[in-house]
């Protein structure tokens, strides 16, 4: 009888130890979700996230929907929560569409962060932000102004969708800057490629054909910008200023051929790394309130800013924005220094 009791205690002890190990492993799993898979920009961000995971000894899973949809992202969020992931970092396709799922996840103790494209601030803890809407909207207009030296000009905006958070915030600021600083510029159209390469090319060609006297296309989207450049080449429009945001590896041939003089972005690999380091800080219960800083190896210090930096009115403890240290304008003189 005593021998049987000893065996039972040993089994229970072993089971308890195994459970503890499993719990530790589960607490070290982070999901990193893009708007969709198969786009170089998001893949690069995922690479940065997974590199940070390896450095920290954390299992980082990169996965996203094949199309940019709320339902696809919600399904992934729910799956990761049910699998016991401890943190989820998502580039949201909608500011509010993911909120019910994200709030449920937070109620279950999952740390929720956003990167690239934000939700409403009450639906996450921190947004790893490439730049404020004012910074990025100004950057778009300034790049166009470097090439459009006419007082009166015709400009088109072309990006992913009318509902995506980040790009619409940038475009709103860009249009306001045009109204204030370039009142002679006419915004002739705003169109969307819906993160589809084929549709983006068709839309870009349609814009150029519909407005033969167009002076500039502003395309703050990783699919729309190369599509606009390719459309200009297909239609032999050499005198069109094409600016926006995309990755240097995608845009390099257009810059080398002179179709695109300059375009902008930020180091998205760095953005992925910062996202995971911030999530890890939350998992380790490190102080992460407004004004607190985090030292990230190879990157430097990042600081938590209030949500008001993004134009929000919501502030709470353990909630804010972490801005990337810098943004980059790429041209033929510096593009070969970057590989992502």
From Swiss-Prot:
InterPro entries linked: Bact_Solute-Bind_Prot2, LsrB, Peripla_BP_I, SBP_2_dom
Function: Part of the ABC transporter complex LsrABCD involved in autoinducer 2 (AI-2) import. Binds AI-2 and delivers it to the LsrC and LsrD permeases.
CDD domains: PBP1_LsrB_Quorum_Sensing
Protein name from the UniProt record: Autoinducer 2-binding protein LsrB
Tree of life domain: Bacteria
One cellular component (GO) term of this entry: outer membrane-bounded periplasmic space
Family the entry assigns: Belongs to the bacterial solute-binding protein 2 family.
Signal peptide feature range: 1-26
Subunit structure as annotated in this protein's UniProt entry: The complex is composed of two ATP-binding proteins (LsrA), two transmembrane proteins (LsrC and LsrD) and a solute-binding protein (LsrB).
Keywords: Periplasm, Signal
UniProt-recorded Gene Ontology molecular function terms: carbohydrate binding
Stretches assigned to coiled coil: none
Compartments in which it is found: Periplasm
């Amino acid at each position: 009888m005593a021998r049987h009791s000893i065996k039972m205690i040993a089994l229970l002890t072993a089971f308890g130890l195994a459970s503890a190990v499993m719990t530790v492993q589960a607490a070290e799993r982070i999901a990193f979700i893009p708007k969709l898979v198969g786009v170089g920009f998001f893949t690069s961000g995922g690479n940065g996230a997974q590199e940070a995971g390896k450095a920290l000894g954390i299992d980082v899973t990169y996965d996203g929907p094949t199309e940019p949809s709320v339902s696809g992202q919600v399904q992934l969020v729910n799956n990761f929560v049910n699998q016991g992931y401890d943190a989820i970092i998502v580039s949201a396709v909608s500011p509010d569409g993911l909120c019910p799922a994200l709030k449920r996840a937070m109620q279950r103790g999952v740390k929720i962060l956003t990167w690239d494209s934000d939700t409403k601030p009450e639906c996450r803890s921190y947004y790893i932000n490439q730049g404020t809407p004012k910074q990025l909207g100004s950057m778009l207009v300034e790049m166009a102004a470097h090439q459009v030296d006419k007082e009166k000009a015709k400009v088109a905006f072309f990006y992913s969708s009318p509902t995506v958070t980040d790009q619409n915030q940038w475009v709103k600021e860009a249009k306001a800057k045009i109204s204030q600083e370039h009142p002679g510029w006419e915004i002739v159209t705003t169109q969307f490629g819906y993160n589809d390469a084929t549709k983006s090319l068709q839309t870009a060609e349609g814009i150029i054909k519909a407005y033969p006297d167009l002076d500039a296309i502003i395309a703050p989207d990783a699919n729309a910008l190369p599509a606009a450049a390719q459309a200009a080449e297909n239609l032999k429009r050499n005198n069109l200023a094409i600016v926006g945001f995309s990755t240097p590896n995608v845009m390099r041939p257009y810059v080398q051929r002179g179709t695109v003089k300059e375009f902008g972005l930020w180091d998205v690999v760095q953005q992925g790394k910062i996202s995971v380091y911030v999530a890890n800080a939350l998992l380790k219960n490190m102080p992460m309130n407004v004004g607190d800083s985090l030292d990230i190896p190879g990157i430097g210090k990042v600081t938590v800013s209030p949500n008001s930096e993004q134009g929000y009115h919501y502030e709470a403890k353990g909630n804010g924005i972490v801005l990337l240290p810098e943004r980059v304008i790429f041209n033929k003189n510096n593009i070969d220094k970057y590989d992502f």
